[in-house]
Amino acid sequence: MAVLALTAAACAAPDAGGGDEGVVLTLWTRAATEAVSKAYADAYNATHRDRVEVTAYPNEEYPAKLASAAGAKALPDLFAADVVFAPQYASQGLWADVTDRFAALDVKDRVAPSHVRAGTWEGRNFALPHTVDLSVLLYNKDLYRKAGLDPERPPRTLREYAEHARKVDALGGDVHGTYFGGNCGGCVEFTMWPSVWADGGDVLDAEGQEATVDSPEMADVFALYRSLYEEGVAAPASKDEAGPTWLGALQSGNVGIAPGPSVWLDAIEAKGVDVGVAPISGLDGGESTFVGGDAMGIGATTGHEDAAWEFLAWTTSDEAQVGVVAKGKGVPTRTDLAENEHAEADPRLVTANSLVAKGRTPYARNFNASFNDPQSPWLRTVRGALFGDAALALADGDEAITKSLRQG
């Protein structure tokens, strides 16, 4: 696939423009992003000559589907992917180079910087943010009141988060102070890495070739979560949580405060839980977030590159980011739109949106195998750091993750 970009021009037909009827653009996405992708497409189709048709695939099947299409030189006109895959797909030439087009956008300096970085390879731009999901603290205001905590005053440090969790846990019964995905590499990186960043630490070098998990900052963050589990403040199910029941635990109304995805706000509220939102902090302050979500680029084999770019550029506009994303209670991909007419009606959304400019998206070509795969060296590191020999796990993890990052 690394040579795909070199052959794409020969394989793709000229952009015919589709005459008066316009062209029909194919857009692929994973199921997790389907609703937002279709909302973009519906709004675009209502006001443009060209049309965008969205096809979604099951999350677990999507990477293989893209690999197969790339091998057959039959990629869709546009496709989105989990942003942590962006460096890999950019390096393999699956997306067309949009460097010059992106540089000409008036809003280029206001597009989520960590997403732009993720879609960059060897100084060239290949993808833009399509959706943004942020890690935040989600807390149960009713349990805060019962525990004697101020529901309008969330924790401002990670140590304070632990104190609040302990106070809620003291309510007893079915109530637990906190919850986390202790058997899920992606869950842990999404929720705990921001505390490392807020404390001035890092997890990877800038090029994604060397792990730096064996650091004082990482050790301290793991130690805090480990203590909450050992004290029984974190729900017992945290140890084996691999992701599928994570949301359900927070929807139960029996968890005081926990880090999680900002997109869960509505889903938790739908169960009758009064939810507060706060930034994830370092042990003694600061704040950061894992800027997740999906990146989107133009399929390298498209015959409609101009039309595809017109849609991709439109998704960065006020019309799309306020009229589609913010209206649907999503996080705008533009840093200057954190406060908008829809978010201002709910201060929690402004809190989340403002983190886009402060957060990070990890950059590594071999990220999935190194961190997200169930067999990844990162998950082994997590298990050891939380429930085993922490010092040994972090030391071994540094070496094993670095080796994995440099493969391929």
Regions found by a protein language model. Give the residues of each.
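Extracytoplasmic/periplasmic substrate-binding proteins
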Residues: 191, 222-304
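Hinge/lid segment of periplasmic solute-binding proteins
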Residues: 83-134, 188-191, 274-278, 342-347
